[in-house]
Amino acid sequence: FVDCDYAIRECMKNTLVVVVDTHRPNFTECPQLLEISDKVVVIDHHRRGVDFINDTVLLFHEIYVSSTCEMVTELVQYIEDDVRINKLTAEGLLAGISLDTKNFAFKTGVRTFEAASYLKKSGADTIEVKKLFNSDIKDFITKAEIIQNAKVINNNICLAYTKTETDNINIVIAQAADELLNIKEVEASFVLARKDDRVFISARSLGDRKS
């Protein structure tokens, strides 16, 4: 991976910039690239918000699929017959599908399983995928702290927070938000954290609520 400064130096007007898993400029790692390049592609599955990346050369936006990884897998699978992905890429895409579907429990359709089947045929190892979600001891303790601080309001909404700052705090709070949905009668969860003077919020819900 490269940082924003390096990307800005390397990006030119005809550079292809691909934005995945968001359609909002301020949610990208380096919004400046969207101003430099004339070739922007957006691939996303979230409901359209007020802020939207305009002037794209390709917009692939479907809110009824499980994940952006499912969409990328479909592109790879159907655009060209001779496209092959390596084992690591297949495992990364399968991990993304597993994460967004809570291990194929939510927002899972026929296309989701077809994508997973293709990734498995491409060499994805489910044990290696599981290992991608393993936490180190510090992150594990932080997640436990979040769950310990959780409060249920209105009988079905769970709120939690942590004051601990870690490098992977956005991943930790996402995993904690998923865990909180396992509490009986909880339909939605919100977890807050702070890092580098920025506040991160991870929201999760069951099918009846929008997250």
Predicted segment positions?
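Hydrophobic helix-and-loop "lid/oligomerization" segment in the mid-to-C-terminal part
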Residues: 1, 8-15, 94, 102-211
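Catalytic-core regions built around general acid/base machinery
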Residues: 32-37, 115-118
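A generic local secondary-structure boundary/capping motif
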Residues: 5-8, 29-32, 59-62, 83, ...
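N-terminal small/polar loop signature for handling phosphorylated ligands or for N-terminal nucleophile
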Residues: 1-35
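Short helix/loop capping segments that flank catalytic or ligand/cofactor-binding pockets
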Residues: 27-29, 51, 106-107, 170
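Hydrophobic/aromatic beta-strand patches that form the interior of the parallel beta-sheet core
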Residues: 16-18, 39-43, 58-61, 158, ...
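Short alpha-helices
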Residues: 45-116
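Residues immediately C-terminal
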Residues: 25, 48, 182
